[in-house]
């Protein structure tokens, strides 16, 4: 295997510099949910005694945003995403308060995409209408399945009928709706996974995300693993999902993302193209670029601690610069998830590094049939997309196993 070129040998002691800053998104984390799912490794928490300190948390978010302004001064927001947890547990009044503050404090691109995640078990028609009035223009529903037996196995609080009903209500209020679905579920058959994806297609939503269930560390499923489809069956499910969605007019523009024409997730595309994002709220992550450095941040994870630290104007638990030996891998780890890959010039625009810094790795990936490239673009091949971990491992700074 070809050895990695040391970036210090390419650049000497000169620090890489960005000549232009990438697009900037805003991520807002609302960490509470009705019930923690056994497969979930996100920063989500069941409220103590069922009570969410909603007003205090909204005030903390706005304070957090105000304190972050010097890092992003003058930069326009291209998208906003309310993630969780279950953001739809919050009132439309609170969402409106947060968005009003964001619009007051930050310049916005014309008609930014503003997404809110919702759980089918917390769907109310009036509430969705009020979310739209507050400024939400894209809804992401955590359906996971339309099969009640599988939903019960996943520990979800809704059943198949509620999944269908939630989509109907969402579509009455929003033109842009994403459904999160999962496959390779406990005891799931190929036919059952096909039924889920076909049902989603008949609803005609603008976007579908299809995720392979994985047993993440620090989850109940990791401690007590359920019986899951084997790798061969899971691969059959993935191929069948891709073929079914393609036949219904959806473009598989990213590993797990499928959209109707021109309705890709703008927020997630910014992530995948190594754009910037300011994350506020408990456990939220940020990536912020400056001309001479790229910084990653994480807010305090526990809601109670985040509230206390935000009141002291110290919400950051961790902050570090992305080393120049890490920038190439971080860019490729995201951009190679995209079916269309990336424009070659974007590598230098987003990392500050010449693309020659990863020339040997590109050569190796091409020789192994994992990417195709010309002087304009680098694109993962179908083989590279299917064996993405093998492709990404080529670009690891020290060749750690993924």
What are these regions (language model features)?
Residues 30, 280-282, 382:
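Pocket-edge structural micro-motifs
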Residues 9, 13-16, 21-25, 43-71, ...:
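C-terminal scaffold of the Radical SAM
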Residues 1-7:
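N-proximal helix/coil linker or "cap" segments that precede and/or mark the start of modular domains
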Residues 29-44:
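Local cysteine-cluster metal-coordination motifs and their immediate loop/turn environment
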Residues 367-376:
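A short, conserved structural fragment
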Residues 383-402:
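Short, amphipathic alpha-helical interaction segments positioned at domain boundaries
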């Amino acid at each position: 295997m070809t050895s990695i070129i040391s970036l210090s040998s390419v650049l000497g002691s000169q620090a890489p510099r960005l000549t232009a800053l990438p697009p900037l998104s805003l991520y807002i984390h609302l960490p509470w949910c009705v019930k923690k799912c056994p497969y979930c490794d996100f920063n989500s928490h069941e409220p103590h005694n069922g009570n969410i300190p909603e007003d205090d948390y909204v005030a903390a978010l706005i304070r957090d945003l105000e304190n972050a302004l010097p890092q992003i001064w003058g930069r326009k927001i291209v998208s906003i995403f309310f993630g969780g947890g279950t953001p739809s547990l919050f009132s439309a009044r609170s969402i409106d308060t947060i968005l009003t503050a964001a619009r007051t404090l930050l310049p916005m691109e014309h008609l930014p995409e503003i997404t809110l995640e919702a759980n089918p078990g917390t769907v109310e028609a009036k509430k969705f209408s009020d979310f739209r009035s507050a400024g939400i223009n894209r809804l992401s529903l955590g359906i996971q399945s339309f099969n009640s037996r599988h939903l019960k196995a996943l520990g979800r609080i809704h059943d198949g009928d509620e999944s269908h009903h939630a989509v109907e209500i969402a579509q009455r209020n929003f033109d842009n709706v994403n459904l999160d679905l999962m496959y390779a579920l406990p005891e799931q058959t190929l036919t059952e996974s096909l039924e889920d994806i076909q049902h989603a297609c008949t609803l005609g939503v603008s976007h579908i995300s299809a995720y392979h269930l994985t047993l993440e560390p620090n989850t109940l499923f990791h401690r007590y693993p359920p019986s899951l489809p084997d790798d061969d069956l899971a691969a059959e499910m993935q191929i069948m999902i891709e073929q079914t969605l393609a036949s219904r007019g959806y473009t598989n523009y990213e590993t797990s993302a499928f959209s109707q024409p021109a309705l890709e997730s703008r927020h997630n595309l910014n992530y995948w193209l190594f754009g910037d994002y300011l994350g506020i709220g408990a456990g939220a992550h940020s990536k912020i670029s400056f001309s001479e450095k790229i910084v990653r941040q994480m807010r305090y994870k526990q809601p109670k601690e985040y509230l206390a630290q935000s009141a002291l104007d110290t919400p950051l638990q961790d902050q570090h610069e992305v080393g120049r030996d890490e920038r190439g891998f971080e860019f490729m780890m995201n951009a190679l998830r995209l079916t269309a890959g990336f424009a070659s010039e974007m590598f230098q625009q987003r990392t500050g590094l010449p693309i020659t810094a990863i020339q040997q790795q590109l050569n190796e990936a091409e020789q192994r049939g994992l990417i195709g490239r010309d002087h304009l673009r680098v694109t993962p091949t179908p083989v590279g997309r299917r064996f993405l971990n093998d492709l990404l491992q080529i670009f690891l700074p020290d060749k750690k196993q993924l």
